[in-house]
Curated annotation (Swiss-Prot):
The gene is HS6.10. Hydrolyzing C2-epimerase involved in the biosynthesis of capsular polysaccharides. Catalyzes the C2 epimerization of UDP-N-acetylglucosamine (UDP-GlcNAc) and the subsequent hydrolysis of the product to form N-acetyl-D-mannosamine (ManNAc) with the release of UDP. It comes from Campylobacter jejuni subsp. jejuni serotype O:6 (strain 81116 / NCTC 11828). The lineage of its organism: Bacteria, Pseudomonadati, Campylobacterota, Epsilonproteobacteria, Campylobacterales. This is UDP-N-acetylglucosamine 2-epimerase. Pathway: Capsule biogenesis; capsule polysaccharide biosynthesis. It catalyses: UDP-N-acetyl-alpha-D-glucosamine + H2O = aldehydo-N-acetyl-D-mannosamine + UDP + H(+). UDP binds at residues 11, 15, 101, 204, 237, 283-284, 289, 303.
Length: 373
């Protein structure tokens, strides 16, 4: 029986791979193994590893890769060491990683250097931040590419990746949106939310803008307070500068119009997002999940500059006046939803490729494919 090893370090990447992991776990042909690390094991960010157990997953290996200082470079080195030890003991046949963070980078390095096939989900995406460098580095280490669309496929081919190693499966988390059965009343009761109307806030640090992050967050908080609306605030990820954003959020803690959470369970988050007046911040879900659920969005700052926008989203600088103006006009965007996302049966496609042996026909010896210009 082949062992399929997934690594997950955040609530975000877990939502992307959850449906794929279910397919593997429910199969009699493969053994699912999970390496849980990163933010999942931090009480400051909601100790979200418990969600994996609640969802019925087994074979979970927990590994703490951060110390109290949350230094990303040290966490990368620690993850490489811990993942290497685990892999040498487990001897997996395939390592599956997602996205652009240090945890998948560590796993891809270990896989590449140990001649183990690595499959990378959502390579070929661009955001316009340092995340792109990590994502493309992971793609160059990976042997199998599971991408969203033709745009991502072509970008990987520009990076010299073999077309035969690229499989379009769509975005795996979107299929979960159709299966969500949590009602709005249930979600509000679970998190003690008493607002009739509300918006969501998700604002993450841009590591290359560390000197201005505090000012950006202060401007955002100022605009939100002045708007006189209700907000459900979800903590940022643990990238460099997250503490500065949390410092700005201190001003919101005793304000009854703000409810702050380190993390939300994915199913409950989706229900709250679907029923929100709008979502504001710089999370990629503003351009994907919110679009699919027909929730208008306000993108603040540069974090998603490289991604395709749409007419349902307002883009503003991290300036309090611009942000407040966008909040006051966002209701006009909510009837414009002409943009559509193609939803593929991602987990089914993934499992069919896995079952057919397509992945295992690929060599761990990569060859750069030139594009004739």
């Amino acid at each position: 029986m082949k062992k399929i090893l997934f690594i997950t370090g955040t609530r975000a990447d877990y939502s992307k791979i959850k449906s794929l992991m279910y397919r593997v776990q429910n199969s009699s042909e493969f053994e699912l193994c999970i390496f849980a690390t990163g933010m999942h094991l931090s009480k400051n960010f909601g100790y979200t590893v418990k969600e994996l157990y609640k969802n019925g997953f087994k074979n979970i290996y927990e590994f703490i890769n951060y110390d109290k200082y949350y230094q990303t470079d040290k966490a990368l080195a620690t993850t490489i060491d811990g993942f290497s030890r685990y892999v040498n003991e487990l001897k997996p046949d395939l390592i599956v990683v997602h996205g652009d963070r240090i945890e998948p980078l560590a796993a891809a390095i270990v896989g590449a250097l140990n001649n183990i096939l690595v499959a990378h989900i959502e390579g070929g995406e661009i955001s316009g931040t340092i995340d792109d460098s990590l994502r493309h580095a992971i793609s160059k280490l990976a042997h199998i590419h599971l991408v969203n669309d033709e745009f991502a496929k072509k970008r990987l081919m520009q990076l010299g990746e073999d077309e035969k190693s690229i499989f379009i499966i769509g975005s795996p988390d979107l299929e979960l949106l159709n299966d969500n059965k949590i009602s709005l009343n249930e979600a509000k009761k679970y998190y003690d939310i008493n607002y009739e109307n509300y918006a969501l806030l998700m604002f993450h640090p841009v590591t290359t803008e560390i000197t201005s992050i505090k000012n950006q967050a202060d401007n955002l908080v100022k605009a939100l307070i002045q708007s006189n609306k209700n907000y459900i605030v979800i903590y940022p990820n643990n990238d460099l500068g997250f503490e500065l954003i949390l410092q700005s959020y201190e001003e919101l803690k005793n304000n009854p119009r703000f409810k702050l959470f380190p993390s939300l369970r994915f199913e409950y988050f989706i229900t709250l997002l679907k029923n929100a007046d709008f979502i504001i911040g710089n999370s990629s879900c503003i351009l994907k999940e919110a679009l699919y659920l027909k929730t208008a969005g306000i993108l603040v700052g540069s974090r998603q500059n490289g991604r395709l926008g749409n007419e349902n989203t307002l883009k503003v600088n991290a300036n309090s006046d611009e942000i407040l103006k966008a909040i006051n006009t966002i209701h006009k965007k909510q009837d414009l939803f002409s943009a559509k996302l193609e939803i593929l049966d991602s987990s089914k496609l993934f499992f069919e490729y896995l079952q057919s042996g397509e992945f295992f026909k690929l060599s761990t010896q990569k060859v750069f494919k030139d594009i004739i210009i």
